Amino acid sequence: MLDLFVPGYVKFDADNPPISGKGGLPPGFCQFRGIEVMCGPRGLPGEGDHLFRNNGDGTFTDVSEKAGVSDPKGYYGLASVFVDVDDDGWLDLLVANDSVPKYLYRNKHDGIFEDVSYLSGFALNDEGRAQASMGIAVGDYNRDGKVDFYVTNFSDDYNTLYRNEGEASFSDVSFQGGVANLTIPFLGWGTGFLDYDNDGLPDVFVANGHVYPGVDRQDWGTTWAQRPLLLRNLNGVKFEEVPPATNSGLADVVCARGAAFGDLFNDGHIDVVLNVMDGPPVLLRNVVKNSNHWLTLKLVGGPKSPRDAIGTKVFVTTGNVRQRADVFSGGSYASTSDPRVHFGLGVAEKVDKVEILWPSGAKQEVRVPAVDQILTVVEGKGIVAP
C-alpha cells in the first residue's frame, strides 16, 4: 500500500501576515539585495513534515514522529521523493528545503527512518553551505547502476548535481559536471532527468522563474520571467546547455514553477508541461528528429506490490550499456510525471536484457521483441496486451 509524505513550509496566518520590523521579525528577513520584499522564509516559524501511513481501509495514520521524519527543527520543505538510494530494497526519503539544509532519511526496515542528511553529503553543497532548494530530479545520469540527484536552487547560487558513491554517500559534482555556473542567474523549480534525444544518456530539464516581481526594475542580471534550461548529457560525466533556438519552447520566457515529464503523444519522445505563475500551463512538445531508438515500459505491480509499481527499478541492457530507471512519485516541484519508464537506446536496434526489481522483492526478466514501442509488463506475467 502506498503511504503519503507531506513536507511543511511555514506557519502562515493570512489574517496576520508577517511585516518587516514587527512581531520580532528583523527587517533583514524582508529584504532582497537591499529592497523590500515579502518576508521569509527565514525568520518565520517553519511547519513540520508529516508521514501518513496507509491503513488499507481508506484512512491514514500520522506516524511522523514515530518514524523520525517530523522535522522538529521546522525546516522549510518544498519537494520530496521516496527512492531507494542504497539499493537495499527499501525506499528512503529525500526532502528539498528552502534556505536550510536538505534531508535524507535512510529506511531502517522497521518503520523508522534514520536522518543521514549530513553523513550522506546531501544536506549541504560542496562548499559546506545550505542552499535554497526547490526541486529534485531522480536518475542514473552516469549509468553506473546507482541513482543520482539534481537539485534546483535560488538565483545567485548554482543548481546541485549529487553523484551517488554507494552506501548512501553523495558527492557534489556540479562544477565538474558543467551544471553550476550556467545556472547561477536562474531561479530553478521543477526539474527532471529525461533523455530528450534518445541517445541513452539522461539529460536534465529545469523550469525557472523568480519569486520577486521587482527584480525587473533592477539591474541584477536576472528577471521575473525566465526561460527553461535543457542540459545535454555528453558522456555520463559532463553536461552542456542546449541553446534555445528562436521561437522554440526553450526560448519561451515565463515565470514557471512545476515541471512534469512524459511521452504525451506516445511517439517515443519525452515532452514537458510547465505550471506557470499567473498564466496557463505551457506544453513543450519534443520535436527532436534523429534515428535513435527507444523503449517505454508501463509497469503493473502484482498483489504484493503497488499496482502503479511505485518503487520498482528497471535495468535495460543494450550491448555493453546498462541503464537504470526508477518508478517514483514526487520529486520535481509541485508535479507528478508519467509513471512509465522511458529508455533512449541510441543506435541499438535490439534490447539484450530487461531486468525488473519489483517492490515485493520479486525479480523478473522479460524479452523485448522489438524496439521503438510501448509495452505493458505485469509482475509475474510478463508482457501483456495494452
Predicted feature residues:
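Short, solvent-exposed beta-strand-terminating loops
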Residues: 8-22, 102
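Blade-edge motifs of beta-propeller repeat domains
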Residues: 17-75, 106-131, 163-186, 217-254, ...
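Loop/turn-rich, solvent-exposed surfaces of beta-rich toroidal or solenoidal domains
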Residues: 147-153, 193, 197-213, 217-227, ...
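Gly/Ser/Thr/Pro-enriched helix-cap/hinge segments flanking short amphipathic alpha-helices
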Residues: 178-181, 221-386
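Structural signal for beta-propeller blades
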Residues: 13, 49-50, 101-104, 157-159, ...
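Hydrophobic beta-strand segments that make up the repeating blades of beta-propeller
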Residues: 3-8, 92-97, 146-153, 204-207, ...
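Beta-propeller blade termini
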Residues: 1-2, 53, 77-87, 91, ...
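Extended catalytic-interface subdomain
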Residues: 7, 50, 54, 139-141, ...
